[in-house]
Amino acid sequence: RVEELQNLYSLPDNIVFYMATPPEMYEVIPLGLQKCGLAYTSDGFRRIVVEKPFGTDIKSAKHLTRLLESIFDEHDIYRIDHYLGKETVQNILVLRFSNGIFEPLWNRNYIDHVEIVSSETLGIGNRGGYYESSGALRDMVQNHLLQLMAFIAMEPPVAFDPESIRDEIAKVFKSLHHYTPEEMQEQIVRGQYTAGTIAGESVQGYRDEKNVSGDSVRETYVAMKIELDNWRWAGTPFYIYTGKRLSEKKTEIIIHFKSTPQQLFVGQCSGSSCNQLIIRVQPNESIALRFGLKIPGSGFEVRQVSMDFLYSSLSDKKLPDAYERLLLDVMLGDSTLYSRADAQEASWNFIDPIIKNWVKRRKDGLAFYASGSDPEEIDRLMPHDKKCNCCNEMM
């Protein structure tokens, strides 16, 4: 049928296979393509797109990579992450590497800490079967949030081409500090939502969802303090938060710059969050810079103000859907925004020990939180002196 269509419309022999299927089909489909001869061509290209999850641990990720590479070349394997198709995420590279005012400050000397937040008001819906075998750590942290962190933490690439950029992303994952068992208890919070109220509506708890065990210990919330063992970021923590059934749906990155060494003015922010660069990924893709200014009138009282930019203000045209951009890149052969095998394996090397620790501990350390609120346990992750103390309202 494919050959008939190509001949009918005089199309080149270029085919993209997009595996938006259950993970258990990730081996069956490539082997089937190989068996029927569709995986090869002498006059065009064959590319395959793989949705997450790309494996469930380091062993399965390596196995899937070996299988795909036995049929396709690595540069024809596209591991898709729709977060990287969002305009704001792509603009992190431009913001950092085309503006001289930011890059000189983008290091441990001037940045106190970084927060990466992805929260949802929805529960798991009809995905109980999938979520019971996955959880927030595999579903969100191993791919989406670590990828966002890599864009923030990576070194400048030697050139703006796919391999140079993916080289730097892989280096970030390889520099992830691996937790000791003691650090896992101190620097990671896992939680599960219970019944509660969101936007005035009562919602059920995770264990009451369809296809979920009544005594499940699967996490629907993860908060982590992550450190990178490299020159640029040594001593600067990255805090990652993600969860379902929280009070607000948003994904954003907050860069907290260090405060001045001395507080000279009344009302001056005294925490380490006085100057923030906020990159809003969704909804309403935007960038905001927060800083202190004098309130009009006598004296030198300071208020925090915000300089905002909305991507929608650049054009009346609707921003392209993340998948639209990413699938176009596949057709063009541009793998910049796709994960490479070594980066995937490095991220699984970081995640695997955490999963094994949780399996061993079962419900020990699992925090329960009412839908619409965060687990109380997250307060121990971030020291009080790193929390924003900007008590004056934004102007």
Regions found by a protein language model. Name each.
Residues 1-50, 54-395:
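Secretory/organelle targeting and membrane-embedding segments
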